[in-house]
Amino acid sequence: MTLDDWVQSHRFLDPLAQVRRRIDAAVEQAMPPLPPLSGWDDYVEDFAIGVPLLHSQIPIDLEPGGHAVVRVIHSLASDPQCPTLAEDAAALSSQFQADPLAPRRIVDWLLGDDAWEPVRSGLLRSVGWITLAAGLRPLVQAFTAWRDDDRWLRRYCPTCGALPAMAHLVGVDPGRRRFLRCGRCASEWRYGRTGCPFCETESHRLASVGVDGEGGLRIDYCEACRGYVKTYNGQGDESVLLADWTSLHLDLLACDRGLKRMASSLYELEPVASDAPPPFTTASGEAECESRGNMASLR
């Protein structure tokens, strides 16, 4: 199944898919791959005590990623096809042009430094992490090959430290394994089959909400903390079904059931009034291309 096939069968994702295509095209032009590390010896100690790679003492120059984010935002600001997106991007671009330290501030802010405040924080969070994830791909692949998954059975991302947005069940019982996936940098890591990745409660099994006709996607949630993770129970469509934004309707379903999204999101889910049209007919917000609706936006 391709991404186009999925969007074609989930037409409410169309506006967000259009925005993602424009962002992805701008990122492809602006973000060169960051080089992988020459060695991992300096990270061994931090890894052993649970320090995520991008928060460790190992020297990783992410400032080129900050410069790439500036270029992507500048490109989006001049996109006539998405005027609302262009307007928000133009506000960010003006802020960047007035600050020669903007590339460094962007990277620090994406990693959790609140000393600086962007004028369109949601848009920068979305575009910033989409851009950084593209540049970090070779590093993430090398990191995955180097580390022993059995030594990182932690609830947060080994690369950037975020809580998981998705999970993937791999293999068959009794040896089936669960891998968590970061919604920011797209890293994957192994975690226990039955533990909650948010409050770390252990139970015989997590509660689940199945969704018919959704390609093996379901919602797994913890009855103790009510946190949930969207889970793909299948093989072959990982690039589509583990993308987070392609299953935002499951986030709405979870919200309707009183469950909590613990992971950070690059998209905002907006409440729908009881007399409004069904929430899966449009997607919108600050970064819409045509009409404003009620499902999701780049904040």
Predicted regions and their residues:
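Short N-terminal helix-initiation segments at or just after the protein's N-terminus
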Residues: 100-101, 123-130, 163-170, 257-259, ...
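Cys/His-clustered metal-coordination modules, chiefly Zn-binding fingers
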Residues: 138-258
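N-terminal alpha-helical interaction blocks
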Residues: 1-144, 289
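Long, contiguous alpha-helical scaffold regions
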Residues: 1-55, 231-299
